[in-house]
Each structure stands twice: as C-alpha cells, then as structure tokens.
Amino acid sequence: MRYIKSEPYYEGLPPFNVSGSPFNVVPIHNYPELMKDTCALINAEWPRSETARMRSLEASCDSLPCSLVLTTEGMCRVIAHLKLSPINSKKKACFVESVVVDKRHRGQGFGKLIMKFAEDYCRVVLDLKTIYLSTIDQDGFYERIGYEYCAPITMYGPRHCELPSLQNAKKKYMKKVL
C-alpha cells in the first residue's frame, strides 16, 4: 500500500510503498479532480442528486468530516470510498459511512484495505479511540475485520445519547476500539 504524504498530514502513518502496491488512499479534499468519479461511484450504489453528493464530498477536510478514496497508481481511477463523520455525543469517536467498492473490484480485498487505512488515520491523525458504523447486510465483513455489535447510536444530539433498541430495524450497529 502506498500512502500519499502531505506533511504533516500523514505524519506517523505507515511508510510509503511498503508492499509496492499500485494503489493509493487519499483524502478527497486534497484531490478535487477525483470528486466527479467518486460521486459516480457512490451514486451507483445509493442514487442521490449529483449536486447533493458533490456538496457532501466538498465538505471533506483535514479533521471531520473526511472522505477517503482508494485509487490506482497515478490517481487514474477511484476504486473505493468511505466517509468519516463526527459523532456529537462521542468526542473521541467517529462514524464511518458510505463505504463502497466499485462493483468490478469487489471480493479483492479493497474494502479491507480502505477500512484499515481509515482506522490508522483515525488513530494516528485524528487521535480517535473508537469507530462506529451501521450496516444492513455487511455485518459479516465487518466482524471479520474486528468490529463488534453495539447499541444504536445517534450522530446528533447531546453527549452520551444512545437510541433505544429498535428490534425490527434492519440496520445493525457496530464499533471497533482502536
């Protein structure tokens, strides 16, 4: 995995070209030229207006929210995306959402790769302790990479606010302590 470094942005993250991999993980706000392709990738999975999606991507910053993309060497093609969002009720945590891998590249380890980078980024750059997420049908994947089931949480509202258990809800909430 090769990490693009922009001092001191990635200071402390794993070294460059450790595996000689032809892939990069980068924050989208440092590479605005990737936003249109990223928008198309996300909208292929969860359709939404291009304007709304682009506004969400343009909100990415060095802290939270931050959208990360996995690209080919030379930034030619976006393969995967995820977004890290703040949780108002948990200051040392974030919520990962919009995790998507291009359909042509699923089952090749790219989801695991971008999640691992996001965990490192959260721990080293953002000094966060826990990552939360929700999923409808990918809980097996998240379990395999170390996530555990937890009570539903809200990204908004007062500190330490948890939602009551929703027995019939399809969403499953998970977390990983970093």
Curated annotation (Swiss-Prot):
InterPro entries referenced in this protein's UniProt entry, alphabetically: Acyl_CoA_acyltransferase (IPR016181), GNAT_dom (IPR000182), NAA80 (IPR039840)
Biological processes per GO annotation: N-terminal peptidyl-aspartic acid acetylation; N-terminal peptidyl-glutamic acid acetylation; regulation of actin polymerization or depolymerization
Residues the record lists as binding substrate: 48, 53-56, 88, 98, 134
Domain of life: Eukaryota
An MF annotation (GO) of this entry: protein-N-terminal amino-acid acetyltransferase activity
EC code: 2.3.1.-
Enzyme class, spelled out: transferase
CC terms in the record's Gene Ontology section: cytoplasm
Gene3D superfamilies tied to this protein: 3.40.630.30
Catalysed conversion reaction: N-terminal L-aspartyl-L-aspartyl-L-aspartyl-[protein] + acetyl-CoA = N-terminal N-acetyl-L-aspartyl-L-aspartyl-L-aspartyl-[protein] + CoA + H(+); N-terminal L-glutamyl-L-glutamyl-L-glutamyl-[protein] + acetyl-CoA = N-terminal N-acetyl-L-glutamyl-L-glutamyl-L-glutamyl-[protein] + CoA + H(+)
Keywords per UniProt: Acyltransferase, Transferase
Binding site for acetyl-CoA: 99-101, 107-112, 138
Family statement: Belongs to the acetyltransferase family.
Task of the protein: N-alpha-acetyltransferase that acetylates the amino terminal acidic residue of proteins devoid of initiator methionine. Preferentially acts on proteins starting with Asp-Asp-Asp and Glu-Glu-Glu sequences. In vitro, shows high activity towards N-terminal sequences starting with Met-Asp-Glu-Leu, Met-Glu-Glu-Glu and Met-Asp-Asp-Asp.
Protein name: N-alpha-acetyltransferase 80
Lineage: Eukaryota, Metazoa, Ecdysozoa, Arthropoda, Hexapoda
